[in-house]
Amino acid sequence: MAQSTLYSRVLGTGSYLPPDRVTNQQLTDRLAKEGIETSDEWIVARTGIHARHFAAPDVTTSDLALEASRRAIEAAGVDPQSIDLIIVATSTPDFVFPSTACLLQNKLGIKNGGAAFDVQAVCSGFAYAMATADSFIRSGQHRTALIVGAETFSRILDFKDRTTCVLFGDGAGAVILSASEEPGVLGSALHADGSYSNILCTPGNVNRGVIDGSAFLHMDGQAVFKLAVNVLEKVAIEALAKANLAPEQIDWLIPHQANIRIMTSTCRKLGLPQERMVVTVDQHGNTSAASIPLALDAAVRDGRIQRGQHVLIEGVGGGFTWGASVFRF
């Protein structure tokens, strides 16, 4: 008897934002005390961001991941002990090691010995994590995966650099992906080009207990914008081709929530109406690997995304990395 084809399917979503919501005006007032000039109008015009959330000093990335994961597990209706794969996409882990995924596994009380590891692809990290989990499930190695994007980017921001500190926020989003005979994830595409590593990076490193170089995020905004608008349409089209779908068959586009101008540019190039694009950058800022699952959960919980609809996620991040996935919700 022929063995049925395995797919991976989204069972549930969850997200969490730390309670400290910082508006542009509040951030502007804080920066003014340091002699840094900016304004709500300047930030909104260039990014579309109105507010972001910052984690308290004693809250870690794994803490944010835990709250988002609990909500995704509840929404999926699965037993945590059935989760045999945990992948956390983050660039701001609790420690150099152990991985945030292992810390999360322990905090969830999962004792089944399943695999747990981090993926570091910055803002495209969740697309990388979803494609990786999908491959593991399709191969039969794992059946139920918890994939999380979680960040505390406020820890690596230089609040004397107005071009970067106004952009980012903290948060976490999670998805339960499970083996299914029904198609779920339909196609993915991942790429990287390390020759662009210097345009978005934290150039410092720890050498024998001493930080060598700057530990703060550095970004060449114009170079990032130019690269992003060039690669995002291409990787989205590639993922759609693998899914045997045309852009007009996509019900919802969930781009990495980096900058409203980049997002609308990609949406327009794909020929999709703006109404089909999920936007949370205005209230969350850029939460790096957390942005896509945060936006996905928001659109699921408010009823926009319905079962059976096609969703396209795409993102680009430091490395440089970029990726996209298409799935039927």
From Swiss-Prot:
Active-site positions on this chain: C123, H256, N286
Cellular component per GO, a single term: cytoplasm
One GO-annotated biological process of the protein: fatty acid biosynthetic process
Any one GO molecular function term: 3-oxoacyl-[acyl-carrier-protein] synthase activity
SUPFAM superfamilies in the cross-refs: Thiolase-like
CDD domains given in the database record: KAS_III (cd00830)
Top EC class of this enzyme: transferase
Family per similarity comment: Belongs to the thiolase-like superfamily. FabH family.
Protein name, per record: Beta-ketoacyl-[acyl-carrier-protein] synthase III
Lineage, highest ranks first: Bacteria, Pseudomonadati, Pseudomonadota, Betaproteobacteria, Burkholderiales
